[in-house]
């Protein structure tokens, strides 16, 4: 064994953590997916686990909706991981019991004891820090969030430092798989908390966030917890090019591995047809996403859109069409949409007729009504996206 290997083991033992690893032992970054295939396509699988992600943009842009969507998918993922591990351990226990030896019985008892403790802890949880006090529980449930299982933190008169410390303490337990802070500008730092309203202050919460980022980052990595900070935008008065900035200071931006900007785009009717900005009764809108920064995937898919329906939530089927066109599972020719096989030829049905649809509305109806066709498209889409994201 090399001297450096001995020293690495010594250092890891000293600090009681695996802080030094050989390159081949580096853990691949896991992702929590969006429901939107377009958002997953842009980010190569979703937001990174063990790192900080920022959702920022103007009011009504889709930041909170997208964060709640991630919460719902995180809960599903945590439950699946929990059940898979439980089933795996139960299988191991059964195999040990079949051996019927003293040693195997001892191992089985130990595994059962560990399993009971694991089951008692349950799946990992989502923490939502509602600093804005504006969380709509019904909307969250519509998006698929199990609000009963989610831990909701609603600060009353706590300072930014206290709220951020609460987040660190909860993440450090190891039971939290995702923490969302909504939103950064609503936090008030200690140095201005007790000041009068008319007294000028400088720096805002930058200092508190600087300390927070330094403290929380190792916990996120060690506990494999994802963190989303929702942020607003401000007009940059110092710029002559009508640019915008975000509160929180430079350290916050540096600490974020992924920064996504959300914009409210075109209004839509019930059939996803475009409406004017003055439409009185829109049924939804497109949500524009721009990757402002990424350190966890290639930055080659900077801009995309997903469809938001005001009564049903995220319109996954409309998104499936968009991404299927990118991967040539579907092909558009004029107003017609063609379903392609893996060789790029138009698929035919049992009567040897081409599988094609005139207009996006017809294709959407087919995806809604033909479960077999929908599952086939989703299966092929998942396959190519999974292989690409590995």
Q: What residues fall within each predicted segment?
A:
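The Walker A/P-loop phosphate-binding site
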Residues: 2-149, 172, 357
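Residue-level preference for the first positions of well-ordered beta-strands
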Residues: 52-54, 125, 177-180, 226
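Residues immediately C-terminal
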Residues: 134, 186, 235
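A short alpha->loop->secondary-structure connector
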Residues: 121, 143-150, 195-204, 244-249
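C-terminal regions of RecA-like/P-loop NTPase motor modules
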Residues: 1-21, 88-119, 267-390
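Phosphate-binding/switch loop-helix module in NTP-utilizing enzymes
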Residues: 115-116, 155-225
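Phosphate-binding/switch region of NTP-binding enzymes
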Residues: 170, 202-327
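N-terminal cationic and glycine-rich segments that engage phosphates or anionic surfaces
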Residues: 192, 235-239, 333-336, 351
């Amino acid at each position: 064994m090399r001297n450096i290997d001995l020293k690495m083991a010594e250092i890891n033992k000293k600090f009681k953590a695996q802080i030094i690893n050989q390159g081949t032992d580096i853990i691949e970054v896991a992702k929590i997916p969006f429901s939107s295939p377009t958002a997953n396509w842009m980010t190569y699988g979703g937001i990174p686990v063990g790192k900080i992600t920022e959702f920022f943009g103007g009011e009504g842009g889709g930041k909170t909706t997208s964060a709640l969507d991630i919460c719902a998918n995180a809960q599903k993922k945590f439950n699946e991981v929990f059940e898979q591990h439980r089933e795996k351990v139960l299988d191991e226990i059964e195999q040990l019991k079949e051996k019927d030896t003293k040693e195997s019985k001892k191992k089985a008892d130990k595994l059962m004891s560990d399993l009971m403790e694991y089951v008692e802890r349950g799946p990992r949880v989502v923490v939502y820090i509602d600093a804005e006090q504006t969380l709509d529980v019904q909307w969250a449930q519509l998006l698929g969030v199990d609000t009963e299982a989610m831990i909701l933190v609603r600060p009353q008169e706590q300072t930014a430092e206290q709220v951020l410390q609460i987040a660190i303490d909860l993440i450090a337990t190891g039971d939290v798989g995702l923490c969302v802070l909504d939103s950064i500008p609503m936090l008030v730092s200690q140095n201005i908390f007790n000041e009068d309203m008319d007294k000028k202050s400088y720096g805002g919460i930058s200092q508190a966030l600087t300390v927070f980022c330094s403290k929380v980052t190792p916990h996120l990595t060690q506990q494999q917890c994802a963190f989303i900070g929702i942020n607003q935008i401000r007009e940059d008065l110092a710029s002559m090019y009508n640019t915008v900035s975000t509160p929180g200071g430079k350290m916050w931006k540096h600490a974020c591995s992924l920064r996504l900007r959300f914009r409210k785009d075109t209004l839509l009717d019930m059939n996803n047809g475009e409406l004017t900005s003055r439409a009185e009764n829109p049924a939804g809108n497109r949500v524009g996403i721009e990757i402002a920064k990424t350190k966890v995937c290639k930055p080659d898919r900077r801009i995309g859109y997903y469809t938001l329906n005001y009564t049903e939530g995220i319109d996954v089927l409309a998104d499936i069409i968009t991404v299927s066109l990118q991967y040539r599972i579907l092909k558009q020719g004029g107003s017609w949409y063609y379903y392609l096989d893996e060789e790029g030829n138009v698929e035919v049905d049992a009567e040897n007729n081409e599988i094609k649809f005139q207009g996006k509305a017809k294709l959407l109806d087919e995806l809604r009504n033909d479960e077999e066709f929908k599952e086939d498209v989703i299966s092929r889409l998942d396959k190519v996206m999974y292989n690409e994201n590995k």
